[in-house]
Amino acid sequence: MISYHLKIVIFLFLVSSSVAFSNAHAFCFKEAGERYSVDPLLLIAIAQTESSLNPQATNINRRGTAKESIDIGLMQINSVWFNQLSSEWGISKQDLIKNPCQNVYVGAYILALNIKKNGVNWKSIGAYNAGFSDKTEAARIIYAKKVYNFYVSLLAKNREFVIANASKGVMIK
């Protein structure tokens, strides 16, 4: 259950984020990382893995099941989250595409939930994409390795340079 205070923080963020924001902070990796105690470079590595830093990215997920889902925006927020985001915070699918900053905040929130559930480890990061099911272990490991490779590459660079360029949608290799 999400605490009352967290709902207030998210509501205030949504109100403030509806105002136009500068290009330098358009994707809010640093701010979202601070809010959810996640390294902004890790968020950037996830965004690179998920969407190649494309805020308009939309993908259909079939994953071998009859039920398909949709991933949208920089952090490729999955449609399984849409009802909760809409009912609890008033965030629509269109908001996640139109507001890259909001998309990053939601992605950071989802990652923070994984970390809270399973600890600070690569399984939690892999679960961002593949979930915690035993059936998705192979996909989780592959995904975590992709994020890890981007993350290690980003750690070797100047942190502020990486964050500034990611905020402009520039992939850093």
Regions found by a protein language model. Give the residues of each.
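Bacterial N-terminal signal peptides
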Residues: 9-18
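Catalytic glycan-binding domains that act on GlcNAc-containing polysaccharides
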Residues: 23-173
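Bacterial N-terminal signal peptides that target proteins for export
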Residues: 1-10
